[in-house]
Amino acid sequence: MANGNSATLTRRYNRTVVLDALRRHGSLSRVELARLSGLTPQGIRNIIEDLIDTGLVRETGRRRGQRGQPQIDIEINPGAGYCLGLHVAAGLCHAIATDLAGNVLARPEARAFNGDHGQRLNALEVISHEIEAAAGGLSRLGTGVVVSRPLASRWSATGGLADAQAEFAKPFEALFASAPLVFENDANAAAMAEYTHGQAKGRGDFLYLFLGEGVGGAIVQSGVPVHGGRGNAGEFGHILIDPKGPKCHCGNRGCLHGYLALDGLRHFLPTDAPLAPETLPQAWLDGAASALSRALVSLENIFDPQAIVLGGTAPVWLLHKLVERMGDPGPSVRSDAAETRVEVSGLGQSCALIGAAALPLLALTSPDPATLMKEPSVET
């Protein structure tokens, strides 16, 4: 017999199943939700009643032009609260607040984020006050924090952290742990932005190649980023392109990083020359496009993704130049796919920040079967 704790976990899981269906499909009737989720009609009615009471979903009216009793559509209520996204990079903390439909409510000026715990906490307090003032009384439903480096694991406010990560997390936990708090690396966050708002929407199995000062990536399976045993999955920048190629900081030679990363591109530019379409060296573009083509063929053969999205903090025009110069990659298991094999992100250089705000939304709406197996907490 199920005890009270397992029944509570089951209800929570079923609730996320319903929210996930609404997030992916938009407006749905109770009948459609029952069919998509596999839950009973009575179970759906109970869940929807609870979600309406909490304000997370709303009825949008009856459908017209159908036989019989018109069905009532249900959708996630965009104004149920806001999600806060924070991206820490190059000594700055960037912030954004969105509603549950992804509409931007506030995007304050980036703040310096260095120094000791107190200085960082002060910067976050300023950001928090600016966001709250712009949110118009909406409740914060969660916070996503994105950093430009791999993490030992997908952080949560209750998960175990390595010492350095735990120290970094302290000011965020001091201000934001009252609601779900999720930490993630920039490539995985950018991939989640694509999954919720961009090129990968509706496609749960895809790869994301993050091009910036370095080269990273994300592997998304069933709508969830793969982190690997030590949090380093998706380090596409260290795919070996040419064993006789340039020396990489990892110790190998000929890694993709050496051909694609912006820090390497600058060595091709005259001193103090700006990175612009008219100054882009053809020699770099030729080598980068060739290396990208080789890497993509390998990735397709290993993962057979529904899509590969190219994005990051590199200028969008540069991403398009790379794809145009590359042309169609060589033969792979996806060679005969009807879809475009490589798609450039439409989210621009703020992709990781947009993804940071998407993280708490996904935490709220993504069903995780592992939650059904959690041990009951012991209260003292």
Q: Which stretches of residues belong to each language-model region?
A:
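ATP-binding/phosphotransfer module of carbohydrate and carboxylate kinases, centering on a glycine-rich
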Residues: 1-60, 66-111, 115-130, 136-139, ...
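Short glycine-rich anion-binding loops that position phosphate/pyrophosphate groups of nucleotides
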Residues: 63, 148-151, 212-214, 314-315
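Short glycine-aspartate micro-motif
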Residues: 73, 83-87, 140-146, 206-210, ...
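Acidic-glycine-rich active-site phosphate/pyrophosphate-binding loop
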Residues: 168-172, 226-228, 234-241, 326-336
